[in-house]
């Protein structure tokens, strides 16, 4: 007797084909990124880091020539026991950017490194970075100085790393007016007249208010941060510098824990789930959150 054909395979085949079509039409997965908010840290959409020059904490805190900076200190996390790592300027910029001075102990420019750094790590993990230097003649410029504009490469550490694309080394004029278009992390470097190196405290304070107050107001409503710090206090052994962090996730107040550039770098990295860089591996992230 001839056995009847089983109908089950003919029912199952269209179902499998349908499932295959549905799988092919699924929405594309987002690029894999490390999980943020490591160790209870908040999620932050954008960070802008501004680096000033050569002033101690006592030079700035309560100084009537710096009303805008003192306003930021009052509304943010005011790190009252914060220190640069060393002298002079250039090694501190490298410490803040890469967790190491890369063997540099002077201000002579035009170095080339291929080691890990904040920009390369952000880009490697699917985030973005931008360095905005006032007076930089053009995007990707690698010259040491521009005397007409007050630009100094020694204050621009991302220009020193071969693993950072030249396209992220931009003049301040490229800083977006639409802050939503900012990179994940940006550094803003005023020129020598506006960073307190050659100019006055008042000049720098006025410049900060003109160029960053708009971002600070926007950041409070858009889950973003401003970090304002100094490279060093100039020449003293103590090297205590002002540093203030402002944003909606920050708990305002004076913070007395002893911290330095490595703690700031560690905090930025941890906010985006990056591996700690250089000596930042030994530093704790800042505990300043609501």
Model feature map: region roles:
Residues 2-13:
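Bacterial N-terminal signal peptides that target proteins for export
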Residues 23-24:
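C-terminal motif of bacterial Sec signal peptides marking the signal peptidase cleavage site
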Residues 33-290:
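Flexible, surface-exposed loop/gating regions in the mature catalytic domains
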Residues 27:
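Short, conserved catalytic or interaction motifs in soluble domains
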């Amino acid at each position: 007797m001839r056995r009847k054909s089983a109908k089950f395979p003919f029912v199952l085949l269209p179902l499998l084909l349908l499932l295959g079509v549905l799988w092919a039409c699924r929405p594309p997965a987002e690029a894999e990124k490390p999980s943020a908010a490591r160790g209870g840290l908040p999620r932050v959409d954008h960070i802008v880091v501004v680096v000033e020059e050569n002033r101690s904490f006592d030079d700035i805190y309560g100084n009537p020539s710096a009303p805008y900076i003192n306003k930021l200190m009052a509304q943010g996390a005011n790190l009252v026991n914060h220190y640069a790592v060393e002298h002079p300027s250039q090694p501190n910029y490298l410490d803040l950017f890469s967790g190491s001075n890369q063997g540099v102990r002077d201000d002579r420019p035009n170095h080339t490194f291929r080691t890990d750094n904040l920009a390369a790590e952000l880009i490697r993990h699917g985030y973005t970075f931008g360095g905005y230097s006032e007076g930089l003649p053009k995007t990707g410029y690698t010259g040491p100085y521009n005397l007409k504009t007050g630009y100094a490469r020694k204050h621009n550490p991302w220009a020193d790393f071969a693993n950072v694309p030249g396209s992220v080394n931009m003049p301040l004029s490229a800083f977006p007016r639409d802050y939503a278009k900012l990179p994940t992390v940006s550094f803003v470097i005023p020129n020598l007249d506006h960073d307190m190196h050659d100019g006055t405290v008042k000049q720098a304070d006025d410049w900060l208010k003109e160029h960053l107050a708009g971002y600070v107001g926007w950041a409070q409503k858009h889950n973003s941060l401003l970090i304002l710090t100094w490279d060093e206090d100039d020449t003293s052994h103590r090297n205590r510098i002002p540093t203030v962090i402002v944003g909606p996730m920050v708990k305002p107040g004076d913070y007395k824990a002893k911290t330095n550039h490595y703690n700031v770098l560690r905090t930025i990295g941890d906010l985006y789930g990056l591996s700690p860089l250089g000596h930042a591996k030994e530093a704790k992230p800042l505990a300043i959150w609501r």
